[in-house]
Amino acid sequence: MEALPRRGSDFCCDPFPLLPAHSGDSGYAVKMRDGTIRLLSNAHVLESGQITTWEHYLDNKGLLILQPGGLDLTNAIATVDTWITMAEGGVSIADAALAKPFNPGDVDTSILGLSVPSSVIDPVPGLIVKKSGRNTGVTTGIVEAINVTTRMTYQQYSSFSSFSTLFNNCFTVTPGNFGSGGDSGSVVMAGSSAVGLLFAGTDQLSFGTPM
């Protein structure tokens, strides 16, 4: 199965995920082993140009994270802390990154319109799920398939070139309007349990990676 984030019905944050001024979602606040708080989202939302194995055009550790988003009127709330580097032409673990908030006490751990995640569960076919996203708000869907392998193509503004990478162990959610551009990084929830992180989609389904 192949899903390309191109202009129109498909989405992967914005049609060209590496523009260093994105809009997407901070999935939710996670507590690290040392007790500090980080904001979890997609690498293509938070981290911009560093997600490939190419020579990077921007050193994004410390890159400002803006709220409500780089395409909106904004204020800086966090900086990029760490990310999973994507494997050009290979297999990538996930499209994910963490940001360090300036004022952890200001972070609301709840998800707008949903509950506070209290556990993590695996996706299973037939599971009813919800997500709260920047573009489409709170939507309900059903996990259609698990253990899905999908090839994603990311385009890079700085060079007007692209690279592809495979993601294994993904799951899909239907219907197609479960997510849309700007919803990348949303946490897929089942009740009060986090199921995965939304990172891409087409006009027929959305793709997530398990937590």
Predicted regions and their residues:
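Serine endopeptidase catalytic core focused on the charge-relay Asp
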Residues: E2-N169, M189-G191, V195, F199, ...
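Hydrophobic alpha-helical bundle architecture
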Residues: V173-S193
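A short acidic/small-residue loop/turn micro-motif
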Residues: T202-D203
